[in-house]
């Protein structure tokens, strides 16, 4: 187990301990390295030639925290006709941003909208110059009766001359959650009993002119006698995809696929056929790696047809090429190549979104590497190329860890998330590296969106780790295995099924030479799962709520239910070097729970406040500790919503 062992020093005062305020994202420090292009959480792409140099650049709006902004990636390679996969320069911030910023391409120029607003000079000013449109941005009134949830999320506005009368109309795509609700709507068999997500599209006919618009009342687009619909987040793209002179429609969705609606009417009187899934060249359904996709139709490779530039939830953006071929099932449906994710010159380390880093010398070469989970459900490995004793290491691009020769990934699937089928492509991996089976090789202990705690045994060597398939963490329960008070999942055998998206932390807490486990139990209390030896093998004992506050009450780190449960990221370390194990817990950065006493095998912890003043919290911040400079003092590293890893020296390391 990697646990920083620190000798006793003069006890640092809490005031001093909380005085440092760094929190700077780790940088690759690796000239010439190329990595996936990425903003923070949620990528809304706006391809255009920003600098009028004849090649296409990429603007990406990112409404997350702490990377909120309109970000410009300049094409440093050249004409996308010759090279459709340029290497972009690191992003430059144009402005802050709002949600749901989308481009419209009118007479060879880009016009940019968000709900109820158009932005002038967007390519250079971002959202600084606003013009209000004469339409209520919240005109859609949800009618579903589900009490939970946001009612409406995605609200996408675009210009299009829908009927070819030379006056730009408005199309507005809405994502209605009022029938879906939010969470905990599974029956005992794992069937979702609430409604689906609805992705609908309105047309607001312009009865005036493009220069002086007068918009009619919104009307839903139809397919026959029914509303045209996809599973949330339609991202509508009206272009002539089949070359017959009228405007067809390609939509995205909240999940990962695309739907094509052929215009079987005319340019002036559109009429849409039932939707068909877009296919890739091998005949499989065209799909992105993640979900919450945002496609924008754009002739990126300048070959005369419309490709798709698609943003993913984790901040990446992909080129999805229109091959020019047609489906063998229907010659009207265009066929696209599989997504290729754009690349950029390496700048700051990024592990998807909601990164959950852990510092450990994974390759056994004497320096501290990083492993991290993310929303997509991968475990990514960042190799330290500098050696020990370097505070700002040179990093390699991340590798996704494999099991049995295939990239390891946890996903919820159709019914694995307490928040419903809309979360099928998410995994929310959070991990700890430790020698769980005491064979002198580091293993991985893992929790995820599923709440089933597993470990991946290292069957390789110390310098060349290799992981076996996940195995459950079995517990010797006192009686029946505890179940969660929500959801349809039940523990299998002795396995540990607990609250989702919360860190398992492995350490020899009681000093008996066996590695124990601490994490949230099924009711949100921080529990101690002690290991014990039975013959020649070890067991995990029934948990105790052994971590107490100053009033000797067990620490309940989350009292929420269902989707509000779990979500706590934590790390144990002797942060203040007083010889006692402290707790770092996710907050605006991380709260420092100082160990002040022990009592009858319990640990008494006092919340001494956040480590830093700077707030980098979106969904949460996942804390770990590192010692890149090799001085024996643990420094802070926090994985944020934007997928970046924020570093701060321990105040004890400050000059």
Residue locations for each model-derived region?
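Beta-propeller-forming repeat regions
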Residues: 18-655
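Sec-dependent N-terminal signal peptides
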Residues: 3-13
């Amino acid at each position: 187990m990697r646990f920083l062992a620190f000798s006793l020093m003069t006890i640092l005062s809490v005031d001093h301990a909380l005085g440092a305020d760094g929190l700077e994202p780790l940088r690759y420090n690796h000239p010439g390295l190329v990595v996936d292009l990425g903003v923070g959480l949620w990528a809304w792409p706006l391809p255009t030639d920003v600098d009028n140099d004849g090649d296409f650049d990429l603007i990406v709006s990112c409404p997350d925290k702490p990377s909120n902004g309109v970000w410009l990636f300049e094409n440093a390679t050249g004409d996308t006709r010759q090279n459709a996969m340029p290497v972009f320069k690191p992003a430059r911030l144009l402005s802050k941003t709002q949600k749901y910023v989308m481009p419209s391409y009118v007479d060879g120029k880009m016009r940019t909208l968000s709900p109820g607003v158009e932005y002038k000079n967007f390519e250079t000013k971002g959202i600084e110059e606003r013009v209000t449109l004469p339409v209520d941005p919240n005109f859609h009134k949800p009618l579903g009766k589900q009490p939970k949830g946001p009612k409406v999320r995605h609200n996408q506005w675009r210009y299009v001359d829908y009927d070819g009368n030379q006056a730009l109309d408005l199309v507005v795509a809405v994502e209605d959650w009022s029938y879906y609700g939010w969470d905990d709507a599974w029956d005992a068999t794992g069937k979702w009993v609430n409604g689906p997500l609805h992705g609908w599209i309105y047309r607001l006919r312009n009865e005036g002119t493009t220069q002086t618009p007068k918009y009619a009342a919104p009307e839903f687009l139809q397919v026959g006698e029914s509303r045209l619909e996809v599973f949330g987040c339609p991202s509508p793209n009206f272009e002539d995809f089949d070359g017959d002179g009228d405007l067809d429609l390609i939509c995205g969705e909240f999940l990962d696929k695309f739907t094509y609606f052929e215009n079987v009417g005319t340019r002036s009187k559109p009429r849409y056929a039932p939707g068909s899934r877009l296919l890739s060249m091998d005949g499989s359904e065209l799909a992105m790696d993640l979900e919450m996709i945002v496609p924008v139709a754009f002739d990126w490779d300048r070959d005369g047809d419309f490709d798709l530039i698609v943003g993913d939830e984790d901040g990446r953006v992909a080129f999805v090429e229109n091959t020019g071929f047609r489906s063998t099932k229907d010659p009207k449906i265009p066929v696209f190549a599989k997504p290729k994710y754009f690349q950029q010159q390496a700048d700051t380390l990024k592990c998807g979104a909601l990164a959950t880093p852990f510092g450990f010398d994974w390759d056994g070469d004497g320096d501290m590497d990083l492993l991290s989970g993310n929303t997509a459900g991968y475990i990514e490995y960042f190799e330290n190329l500098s050696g020990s004793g370097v505070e700002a290491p040179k990093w390699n691009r991340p590798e996704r860890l494999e099991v049995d020769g295939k990239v390891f990934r946890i996903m919820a699937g159709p019914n694995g998330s307490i928040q419903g089928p809309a979360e099928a492509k998410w995994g929310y991996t959070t991990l700890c590296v430790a020698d769980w089976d005491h064979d002198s090789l580091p293993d991985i202990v893992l929790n995820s969106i599923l709440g089933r705690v597993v470990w991946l045994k290292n069957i390789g060597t110390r310098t060349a780790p290799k992981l076996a398939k996940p195995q459950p963490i079995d517990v010797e329960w006192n009686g029946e295995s505890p179940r969660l008070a929500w959801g349809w999942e039940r523990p299998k055998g002795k396995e540990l099924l607990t609250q989702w998206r919360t860190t398992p932390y492995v350490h020899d807490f009681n000093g008996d030479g066996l590695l124990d486990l601490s994490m949230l139990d099924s009711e949100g209390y921080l529990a101690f799962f002690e290991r014990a030896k039975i013959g020649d093998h070890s067991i995990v004992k029934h948990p105790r709520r052994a971590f107490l506050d100053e009033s000797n009450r067990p620490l309940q780190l989350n009292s929420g239910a269902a989707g509000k449960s779990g979500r706590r990221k934590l790390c144990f370390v002797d942060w203040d070097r007083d010889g006692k194990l402290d707790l770092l817990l996710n907050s605006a950065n991380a709260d420092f729970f100082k160990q002040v006493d022990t009592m009858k095998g319990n640990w008494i912890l006092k919340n001494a406040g956040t480590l830093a003043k700077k707030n980098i919290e979106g969904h949460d911040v996942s804390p770990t500790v590192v010692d890149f400079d090799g001085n024996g003092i643990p420094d802070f590293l926090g994985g944020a919503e934007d997928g970046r890893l924020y570093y701060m020296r321990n105040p004890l390391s400050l000059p």
